[in-house]
Amino acid sequence: MKTTIILILLTHWVYSQNPTSGNNTATLCLGHHAVANGTLVKTITDDQIEVTNATELVQSISIGKICNNSYRVLDGRNCTLIDAMLGDPHCDVFQYENWDLFIERSSAFSNCYPYDIPDYASLRSIVASSGTLEFTAEGFTWTGVTQNGRSGACKRGSADSFFSRLNWLTKSGNSYPTLNVTMPNNNNFDKLYIWGIHHPSSNNEQTKLYIQESGRVTVSTKRSQQTIIPNIGSRPWVRGQSGRISIYWTIVKPGDILMINSNGNLVAPRGYFKLRTGKSSVMRSDAPIDTCVSECITPNGSIPNDKPFQNVNKVTYGKCPKYIRQNTLKLATGMRNVPEKQIRGIFGAIAGFIENGWEGMVDGWYGFRYQNSEGTGQAGDLKSTQAAIDQINGKLNRVIERTNEKFHQIEKEFSEVEGRIQDLEKYVEDTKIDLWSYNAELLVALENQHTIDLTDAEMNKLFEKTRRQLRENAEDMGGGCFKIYHKCDNACIGSIRNGTYDHYIYRDEALNNRFQIKGVELKSGYKDWILWISFAISCFLICVVLLGFIMWACQKGNIRCNICI
């Protein structure tokens, strides 16, 4: 019985001891900040890892309107760029206009003689990139024919008219002589000439306008030649006409010469457009134009370019984020997040970074928590925090610099006869987008991995720095904490934080306290052994007492035991 009492008292004494509560010791833990709800990001090694903070890299919505600053945006309203160039009567307001971006609306329409352009997309692109409709009339001499043909399908006011940049030539009297006209380019810039050929709806209309049963138009330069023969025949009626005009174009280089030969059906140029090299463009959009500032425009509206990627539209103009297929990509701008546990430590005490993070840190990403004779406290470590922030800052800007396009992505158009080219172009564009989408995901995963690794490294650096300062004056308790074997008040803790701690001052006291404490301190393993031994002895004593009672009762006759075989 005495043995049992002694063991119980010893067990109670063991658990009543708290190694960190003495006035001659202190506990110092290192940790990093945490948040209750972090953000999931992707790294090279993990599909989902929680961090304290992250920045979205994909712009997924526009502002819903096109900003007229930082670019000169020209609203085409009811006119397409080509109609404005040809001089459709209802587009006269656009003559001599300039633009960085010409906006074509879905409500745009032609209101003159019906026409087609076999290479519409190329002509549209050339005129759009020039950024101007500057036109210069030239003195072409057309002898023996009637100029300035008009049509009831093309009203200028209430009068019949025609495209202002083209000259429709028809017979004069009963003749249409062969025309041979030359026009040299003596300037130092490229000239764009627009011309066409008329396709009558019937043979009767052909001879009525041009005498000959079939005309021909040949336009040549030193570098090229085009010969077009009219296709006579009825077509669907458009604005009262079943005939058509096909529009063609020729670029004449400096020192070259334009030659026009025709015996009928010619729609002649009146002059040239001056071609300019630039980054102007054209875009189809119904978004309203408003006064605001944006460096990136899409058909959906302008978008900010403070992110490296966008998922709004493949067609862009200006300094724009790269288009990718992902709706979201998050860049880690904080460390690995380990939410703080409510109960920490073996005795409910403070715990270090290996166990969990610390919520509520406002003065740094890394810091110290301590228990000493003056109580408990917490303080951030600015140096390690700044080192981590300096490495993370600029990541977003570097990603933007790598990905933002400093040019526009124009729309691609092809005629039906170029269907195979269109399919090939679509395949190439889709492949480019897939490649960029993969590269974007890989780039962000690499950056996230680097961010998490470097923030973990800063935590380890701070721990090693503290351990080297304390040396033999403290013991690594595991979990990111140290037990300091000397009295360490708040001033002492402050010297450890700022790197001025002198372990020689406390060395003798620490060694003395360490030996005293080690003499009586029982490790958790010994506590377990004492518990098991105490339990075993108690069970044995209970069995002995019970057996003795049974034997005593049998001897007194109070209990009878019958054994039957």
Swiss-Prot record:
A lipid is attached at residues 554, 561, 564 (S-palmitoyl cysteine). Glycans are attached at residues 23, 37, 53, 68, 78, 180, 300, 498. GO terms for biological process: clathrin-dependent endocytosis of virus by host cell; fusion of virus membrane with host endosome membrane; fusion of virus membrane with host plasma membrane; viral budding from plasma membrane; virion attachment to host cell. The record marks 344-345 as: Cleavage. Residues 551-565 are cytoplasmic. Residues 17-529 are extracellular. Palmitoylated. In natural infection, inactive HA is matured into HA1 and HA2 outside the cell by one or more trypsin-like, arginine-specific endoprotease secreted by the bronchial epithelial cells. One identified protease that may be involved in this process is secreted in lungs by club cells. It is found in: Virion membrane; Host apical cell membrane. Keywords: Clathrin- and caveolin-independent endocytosis of virus by host, Clathrin-mediated endocytosis of virus by host, Disulfide bond, Fusion of virus membrane with host endosomal membrane, Fusion of virus membrane with host membrane, Glycoprotein, Hemagglutinin, Host cell membrane, Host membrane, Host-virus interaction, Lipoprotein, Membrane, Palmitate, Signal, Transmembrane, Transmembrane helix, Viral attachment to host cell, Viral envelope protein, Viral penetration into host cytoplasm, Virion, Virus endocytosis by host, Virus entry into host cell. Residues 1-16 form the signal peptide. Disulfide bonds join 29-481, 67-292, 79-91, 112-154, 296-320, 488-492. SUPFAM superfamilies: Influenza hemagglutinin (stalk) (SSF58064), Viral protein domain (SSF49818). Its main location: virion. It is a single-pass type I membrane protein. GO terms for molecular function: host cell surface receptor binding. The chain crosses the membrane at residues 530-550. GO terms for cellular component: host cell plasma membrane; membrane; viral envelope; virion membrane. It comes from the Viruses. Belongs to the influenza viruses hemagglutinin family. Homotrimer of disulfide-linked HA1-HA2. Major glycoprotein, comprises over 80% of the envelope proteins present in virus particle. The extent of infection into host organism is determined by HA. Influenza viruses bud from the apical surface of polarized epithelial cells (e.g. bronchial epithelial cells) into lumen of lungs and are therefore usually pneumotropic. The reason is that HA is cleaved by tryptase clara which is restricted to lungs. However, HAs of H5 and H7 pantropic avian viruses subtypes can be cleaved by furin and subtilisin-type enzymes, allowing the virus to grow in other organs than lungs. Binds to sialic acid-containing receptors on the cell surface, bringing about the attachment of the virus particle to the cell. This attachment induces virion internalization of about two third of the virus particles through clathrin-dependent endocytosis and about one third through a clathrin- and caveolin-independent pathway. Plays a major role in the determination of host range restriction and virulence. Class I viral fusion protein. Binds to sialic acid-containing receptors on the cell surface, bringing about the attachment of the virus particle to the cell. This attachment induces virion internalization either through clathrin-dependent endocytosis or through clathrin- and caveolin-independent pathway. Plays a major role in the determination of host range restriction and virulence. Class I viral fusion protein. Responsible for penetration of the virus into the cell cytoplasm by mediating the fusion of the membrane of the endocytosed virus particle with the endosomal membrane. This is Hemagglutinin. The lineage of its organism: Viruses, Riboviria, Orthornavirae, Negarnaviricota, Polyploviricotina.
